[in-house]
Amino acid sequence: MLVFWGEFAYYSLIYNIVDVGKGEPDMILTVNIGNTHITIGGYEHDTLIFCGRLHADPSATIDEYAMHLLNLLSLHRVAPEQIEGGILGSVVPALTGRVLAALRLLSTARFLTVGPGLKSGVRLRLDNPAQLGAELLCGAVAALEDGPGPLAIILADTAISMMAVNARQELVGGVILAGPQLSLAALVQNTAQLPQVDLSAPAPGSVLGRNTSACLQSGFILGTASLLDGLAARFCAELGPETRFYATGSLPRTIREACRTPICYRETLVTDGLYSIWRRNRKA
């Protein structure tokens, strides 16, 4: 009984907080389901009001996701009744239906899903367009709002993906490789004496590490930066020297700053792209 009443008080507190933010339904939610995190953005009158993240938990139930979403909304003083509509993009099919069902528990608003049938403004020149991750398409849409191609999107999560958009605004292909955090974790797990290191800590001043940790930092920070620079040069060779590069996701700042290629980092690139696609399709 004590646990029940504790839960009752907790849930009551949540709903009381949400009640403070009640208003007219004018909030558009964007939901991006990645392999590691679920990113939720809230827009009012074309302005991003909040952006929050949840852990992408494959074991969480619909009800648990509904509670997590409600908590996040309450944290930003948004009531479910304020939601006018929304859009969801996902690279984790197993979670797509669960998160959509959780959203429908909270709101009767219509949620679009990024996929065939939605207009994006980007033509896909790929062997199988259905295989393109929603995050990459949304990133390309947001980057093109800054200006026409050629450009490339660098999306860093568990993997690093780089996708190219040519001067005709066509997404024409790219590369996928393991992200530095994943590679480091695999290396540490499969060796006896290599320690875990913090890739967000500054790399040594010299590429020549003088101890094991410094060698790992140089290898992963400068090595990943050099890898990205090399790929960027190859992208420019195919797309043109004026190619612009955008990055988003969990690529550590240390790696971005070690790159010699000018890269525009935008934390909300995918979120902004989702909202742009919603605007194109809101009356569909």
Task: Locate the predicted segments by residue.
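N-terminal glycine/serine-rich phosphate-binding loop of ATP-dependent small-molecule kinases
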Residues: L2-V114, L118
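Gly/Thr-rich phosphate-binding beta-strand-loop-beta motif of the actin/hexokinase/Hsp70
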Residues: D26-I49, A143, G147-L171, L187, ...
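Glycine-rich phosphate-binding loop plus the immediately following alpha-helix
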Residues: D57-E64, L132-A134, G139-P148, V172-Q217, ...
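Glycine-rich phosphate-binding loop signature in dinucleotide/nucleotide-binding domains
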Residues: V78-E81, D146-G149, E238-P241
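Short beta-strand-loop/turn "lid" adjacent to the catalytic site in phosphate-handling enzymes
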Residues: V78-L132, R168-V175, G179-P180, R210-I221, ...
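A short, acidic, amphipathic alpha-helical segment used as a generic capping/interface helix at domain edges
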Residues: T224-E238
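Long hydrophobic alpha-helical segments typical of transmembrane helices together
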Residues: E238-A284
